[in-house]
UniProtKB/Swiss-Prot annotation:
GO terms for molecular function: D-ribose pyranase activity; intramolecular lyase activity; monosaccharide binding. GO terms for biological process: D-ribose catabolic process. The active site is at 20 (proton donor). Pathway: Carbohydrate metabolism; D-ribose degradation; D-ribose 5-phosphate from beta-D-ribopyranose: step 1/2. Homodecamer. Catalyzes the interconversion of beta-pyran and beta-furan forms of D-ribose. Pfam families: RbsD_FucU (PF05025). GO terms for cellular component: cytosol. HAMAP family: D_rib_pyranase. It catalyses: beta-D-ribopyranose = beta-D-ribofuranose. It comes from Corynebacterium glutamicum (strain ATCC 13032 / DSM 20300 / JCM 1318 / BCRC 11384 / CCUG 27702 / LMG 3730 / NBRC 12168 / NCIMB 10025 / NRRL B-2784 / 534). It is an enzyme of class 5 (isomerase). This is D-ribose pyranase.
Length: 123
Protein backbone atom coordinates (compact mmCIF):
# COMPACT_ATOMS: atom_id res chain seq x y z
CA UNK A 1 0.00 0.00 0.00
CA UNK A 2 1.18 3.52 -0.77
CA UNK A 3 2.34 5.53 2.20
CA UNK A 4 1.07 8.93 1.07
CA UNK A 5 -0.26 10.95 -1.83
CA UNK A 6 -2.84 9.84 -4.35
CA UNK A 7 -4.33 6.40 -3.73
CA UNK A 8 -6.52 5.96 -6.82
CA UNK A 9 -4.54 3.56 -9.06
CA UNK A 10 -6.10 4.77 -12.32
CA UNK A 11 -5.27 8.37 -11.46
CA UNK A 12 -1.70 7.52 -10.42
CA UNK A 13 -1.16 5.65 -13.69
CA UNK A 14 -2.66 8.43 -15.81
CA UNK A 15 -0.45 11.07 -14.18
CA UNK A 16 2.66 8.91 -14.57
CA UNK A 17 2.02 8.69 -18.33
CA UNK A 18 1.87 12.48 -18.82
CA UNK A 19 4.55 14.15 -20.87
CA UNK A 20 5.49 17.80 -21.32
CA UNK A 21 2.62 19.77 -22.90
CA UNK A 22 0.07 16.94 -22.54
CA UNK A 23 -3.31 18.21 -21.40
CA UNK A 24 -5.72 16.79 -18.85
CA UNK A 25 -8.75 18.19 -17.06
CA UNK A 26 -10.60 18.38 -13.77
CA UNK A 27 -14.34 18.65 -14.38
CA UNK A 28 -17.65 19.08 -12.62
CA UNK A 29 -20.04 16.14 -12.70
CA UNK A 30 -22.07 17.51 -15.62
CA UNK A 31 -19.44 18.24 -18.25
CA UNK A 32 -19.90 16.20 -21.45
CA UNK A 33 -16.67 14.29 -22.06
CA UNK A 34 -15.82 12.95 -25.53
CA UNK A 35 -16.21 9.16 -25.78
CA UNK A 36 -12.58 8.53 -26.75
CA UNK A 37 -11.12 10.45 -23.78
CA UNK A 38 -10.28 8.45 -20.66
CA UNK A 39 -12.50 9.35 -17.71
CA UNK A 40 -11.26 8.93 -14.17
CA UNK A 41 -14.54 9.16 -12.32
CA UNK A 42 -14.15 10.18 -8.68
CA UNK A 43 -17.76 11.39 -8.25
CA UNK A 44 -19.62 9.68 -5.40
CA UNK A 45 -22.70 11.89 -4.97
CA UNK A 46 -23.49 15.47 -5.91
CA UNK A 47 -20.87 17.64 -4.21
CA UNK A 48 -18.46 14.86 -3.20
CA UNK A 49 -15.62 15.19 -3.89
CA UNK A 50 -15.50 18.89 -4.65
CA UNK A 51 -13.38 20.45 -7.37
CA UNK A 52 -11.24 22.04 -4.66
CA UNK A 53 -10.63 18.76 -2.81
CA UNK A 54 -9.51 17.03 -5.99
CA UNK A 55 -7.33 19.91 -7.15
CA UNK A 56 -5.65 20.18 -3.73
CA UNK A 57 -4.82 16.46 -3.85
CA UNK A 58 -3.38 16.81 -7.36
CA UNK A 59 -1.21 19.90 -6.86
CA UNK A 60 1.70 18.10 -5.14
CA UNK A 61 1.62 15.34 -7.77
CA UNK A 62 1.84 17.14 -11.12
CA UNK A 63 3.80 19.92 -12.80
CA UNK A 64 1.52 22.40 -14.56
CA UNK A 65 2.59 25.20 -16.90
CA UNK A 66 -0.77 26.51 -18.04
CA UNK A 67 -4.53 26.15 -17.82
CA UNK A 68 -7.69 26.81 -19.81
CA UNK A 69 -10.90 27.98 -18.15
CA UNK A 70 -14.27 28.91 -19.65
CA UNK A 71 -15.51 32.51 -19.51
CA UNK A 72 -18.30 31.58 -17.11
CA UNK A 73 -16.04 29.92 -14.53
CA UNK A 74 -16.59 31.26 -11.02
CA UNK A 75 -13.83 33.43 -9.59
CA UNK A 76 -13.18 30.92 -6.80
CA UNK A 77 -12.30 28.28 -9.41
CA UNK A 78 -9.90 30.68 -11.16
CA UNK A 79 -8.26 31.51 -7.83
CA UNK A 80 -7.48 27.84 -7.18
CA UNK A 81 -5.41 27.57 -10.36
CA UNK A 82 -1.80 28.53 -9.63
CA UNK A 83 -0.59 29.08 -13.19
CA UNK A 84 -1.14 31.20 -16.29
CA UNK A 85 -4.75 30.90 -17.41
CA UNK A 86 -6.23 31.21 -20.89
CA UNK A 87 -9.92 32.12 -20.89
CA UNK A 88 -12.05 30.70 -23.72
CA UNK A 89 -15.73 30.19 -24.40
CA UNK A 90 -17.38 27.17 -22.81
CA UNK A 91 -17.83 25.68 -26.28
CA UNK A 92 -14.09 26.05 -26.99
CA UNK A 93 -13.21 24.42 -23.68
CA UNK A 94 -15.47 21.47 -24.54
CA UNK A 95 -13.80 21.21 -27.96
CA UNK A 96 -10.33 21.17 -26.35
CA UNK A 97 -11.36 18.23 -24.15
CA UNK A 98 -10.99 16.03 -27.23
CA UNK A 99 -7.21 16.48 -27.00
CA UNK A 100 -6.93 15.70 -23.28
CA UNK A 101 -5.11 12.57 -22.13
CA UNK A 102 -7.78 12.12 -19.46
CA UNK A 103 -10.52 13.95 -17.57
CA UNK A 104 -11.03 13.64 -13.82
CA UNK A 105 -14.75 13.82 -13.06
CA UNK A 106 -15.54 15.22 -9.61
CA UNK A 107 -18.83 15.50 -7.76
CA UNK A 108 -18.71 19.29 -8.13
CA UNK A 109 -22.07 20.85 -9.01
CA UNK A 110 -20.92 24.43 -9.59
CA UNK A 111 -21.54 25.44 -13.21
CA UNK A 112 -18.36 25.85 -15.30
CA UNK A 113 -16.12 24.32 -12.62
CA UNK A 114 -13.90 22.82 -15.32
CA UNK A 115 -10.21 23.40 -15.99
CA UNK A 116 -7.91 21.97 -18.63
CA UNK A 117 -4.30 21.80 -17.45
CA UNK A 118 -1.14 21.73 -19.57
CA UNK A 119 1.62 19.55 -18.14
CA UNK A 120 5.01 21.08 -17.46
CA UNK A 121 8.36 19.50 -16.62
CA UNK A 122 9.97 19.04 -13.22
CA UNK A 123 13.48 19.99 -14.35
Amino acid sequence: MKKSGLLNPDLCYAIARLGHTDTWAVADCGLPIPEHVEIIDLALVFGIPTFEQVLNALKPEVVVEGAVIAEGAPERIREMVDTDVEVVTHEELKAQLAECAFVIRTGETTAYANVIFKSGVAF
